[in-house]
Every structure is written in structure tokens, then in C-alpha cells.
């Protein structure tokens, strides 16, 4: 027996906007309209559907990834800045915003760093 009933009503504008405020970093009116009429389950599936691994961050000077390079104290600060910029760009993409918001939550929860 579940403690909560499944919310089966279609989302209206207010509920769709609330969901997207909570699950992403904000949404445009167009994005909110995409979720109006969906059930909560369908909306959650849409938010989490884009789970393919993103391309790794690139060094803007060489346009090559540095992910598999040996660790370098001299380069660490520069690489951290590239990763931060790459991550912010991922957060701004509507397709991946829910995944990145969850990543931000867990990154803060487990207090991880570049290491």
C-alpha cells in the first residue's frame, strides 16, 4: 500500500511552471507550455529522458579534451575553470537542465571537487 496517491491529473500552467522551477534552473513560457497537459509521470519522463553522456569539456586553446591527460598541478586551475564553464553551459540547455540540477544537488551534498 502506498502512502501517497498517484497524481494523475494533467498539469496546468501553474503546476507545470512549479515543476520546472523545482526541477530545472527556470523555464521560458514556451517550455512551460510544452508541459501543460502532460501527466506528472510523463513530465518526469520527459525531464529525465536526455540521459546520454555529454561530450567532455574541451581546452578552448587546443579544442582537445583534457579529461584523460595525466594530472598536472600547473594546469589544474585552468582545467577547473573549463569544467565550470562547460557545466554552466550544460545547465543552460533546456534538454539537460533537470539532470544538471540533480548533479548540482549531489555535488553539494557529497561536497566533491575537481579531483
Predicted regions and their residues:
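N-terminal accessory alpha/beta regions
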Residues: 15, 27-115
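Flexible, low-complexity segments enriched for small/polar residues
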Residues: 2-13, 17-29
Amino acid at each position: 500500500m502506498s502512502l501517497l496517491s498517484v497524481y494523475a491529473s494533467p498539469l496546468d500552467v501553474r503546476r507545470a511552471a512549479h515543476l520546472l522551477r523545482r526541477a530545472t534552473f527556470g523555464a521560458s513560457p514556451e517550455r512551460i507550455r510544452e508541459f501543460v497537459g502532460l501527466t506528472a509521470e510523463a513530465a518526469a519522463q520527459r525531464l529525465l529522458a536526455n540521459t546520454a553522456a555529454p561530450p567532455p569539456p574541451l581546452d578552448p586553446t587546443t579544442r582537445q579534451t583534457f579529461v584523460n591527460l595525466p594530472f598536472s598541478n600547473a594546469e589544474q586551475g585552468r582545467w577547473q575553470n573549463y569544467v565550470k564553464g562547460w557545466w554552466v553551459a550544460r545547465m543552460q540547455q533546456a534538454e539537460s537542465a533537470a539532470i544538471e540540477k540533480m548533479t548540482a544537488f549531489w555535488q553539494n551534498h557529497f561536497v566533491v571537487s575537481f579531483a
